[in-house]
Amino acid sequence: MMDNKDLEAEIHPLKNEDKKSQENPGNLPRNEDNLKSKPVPSRLSRCRTVAFFLSLFTCLFVVFVLSFIIPCPDRPSSQGTWKLDYNNAVMYDFLALGDINKDKVQDVLFLYKNTNSSNNLTRSCADEGFSTPCAFVVAVSGANGSVLWERPVAQDVALVKCAMPQTLDSDEVSSACIVVGRAGSFVAVSFFTGETLWSHPSSFSGNVSILSPLLQVPDIDGDGDGTPDLLILAQEGQEVSGALYSGSTGYQIGHRGSLGVDGDGVALLHVTRTGAQYILLPCASALCGFSVKSLYERITGRDGHFKEDPYWENMLNHSVHRRLLHRLGAVRYLMNIPGKAGQDLLLVTSEACVLLDGQDLEPRWTLGEVQVLRKPILGHYKPDTLAVVIENGTSIDRQILLLDLSTGSILWSQPLPSLPGGPPSTSLMTADHRSAFFFWGLHDLVSTNEMDPPDVQHSLYMFHPTLPGILLELANVSANIVAFDAVLLEPSRHAAYVLLTGPASSDVPGLVSVTKHKVQDLVPGSRVIHLGEGSSDSDQAIRDRFSRLRYRSEM
């Protein structure tokens, strides 16, 4: 039988525990401490838990909505190659780029001269008051080559400049193409639609030679819209004069004024370290200068908010015929170059190539005994370090020189024969902060003397500084090249070149073409040219390295 104590404990367990606690009073505080040490769930902690899970589910819901319910915008389907032909036409040496249809792919603008446009639905020469043939401006899609808009703009074009939109919401006036006709027409058309923004006759007569380029100066017409105003230089006899026009309305500001120089060649607008603007112009064997402030006061008769540089004014006042530099030889090219504290000047003459300090015009370096064939271009041979490309020598004896812009030292050189009047070189920034360079030359780099000019083809070569002993021949072109540029149609992913071809003489119309080729599509079928010993990679491995190049926009 069960003991009485055990039976009582089974029937009254709590009572039994009370007896044990009375028998062992020393154990009581320890048990109370254990009870106190156990955390008690609070209302605050429960609220925090609820808030955490609520936030988590909200984030997951938003991700779900954005990923599956709201459709992503369609990326434009970009064709690797497209071509547009015009019969019985003449092509102008002009190319411009910008996102016209706002599909985030750069589109192409160009000029050609023809009896009528390619699209029968667009306006004819007669619709705009021109006789045939006349000049048309055309905007085509960079993605597929379709015509976005096309219209006649002048009887014949002397100057054209397009102000590209900086943002997607840029207004029409600040995003326009300005066209100066040889017969006195002066028109601005919308960059996006081709519609006329304003049109006026210019103040230049038919016997005046209009000098390039069309210069832009800060907004001075007092309308306060911030649109840059326009400066056109013209030469009549030996005298150079200038006229200012409002960029927003096209109306002339004041009257024409003489610069007091007998300049010739291409003008340049230069900004000194003090912010003063000067018009630089080759004149005989010298470099002449004239301040924008003086020109504005001369043509309007009132003071402007422009600056004059005391150092430059002192040089001009102590010179004859406003000459800044003397005994230079024939000035062929003049360029503004980014410097450490502002703009420097790259001056190319018949005798030398000189980098001048942009303030005191002292030489930083000189490359003598050169015969520069074409206008220099800039690129990056080393990461984030500017280099300048010089094409030295005659066409058959041409040599490509890459110079360090800060010192003038030669970084890379390569003989590359070309045809007379060949297209210029260009460069594209790559993701490694260097540049891919594109040069035109002859297909056969060795036996050029045995070729007849009609049988010779232009070849496009690609070079990257990470492979200094390699040239990649991308394409061959037998037609006459009017204009060329390598461009980034889409950020980081769509490098291409655009080519304008047509008759060599503007007096003989013929077939003209606009062609786009994606660079990456040309690399697999390219020809690898080894310039010397040192590369152990196979041709296919080299092509693969060029295919992996990624491009970036220059800031």
Curated annotation (Swiss-Prot):
The lineage of its organism: Eukaryota, Metazoa, Chordata, Craniata, Vertebrata. Residues 1-49 are cytoplasmic. InterPro entries: FAM234, FAM234A_B_beta-prop, Quinoprotein_ADH-like_sf. PANTHER family: PROTEIN FAM234A (PTHR21419:SF7), PTHR21419. It comes from Mus musculus. This is Protein FAM234A. Glycans are attached at residues 116, 120, 317, 392, 476. The keyword Glycoprotein applies. Residues 1-40 are annotated as: Disordered. The gene is Fam234a. One of its GO terms (cellular component) is membrane. It is found in: Membrane. Keywords: Glycoprotein, Membrane, Phosphoprotein, Signal-anchor, Transmembrane, Transmembrane helix. Residues 1-22 have a biased composition (Basic and acidic residues). The modification Phosphoserine is found at residue 21. Residues 71-555 are extracellular. Pfam families: Beta-prop_FAM234A_B. It is a single-pass type II membrane protein.
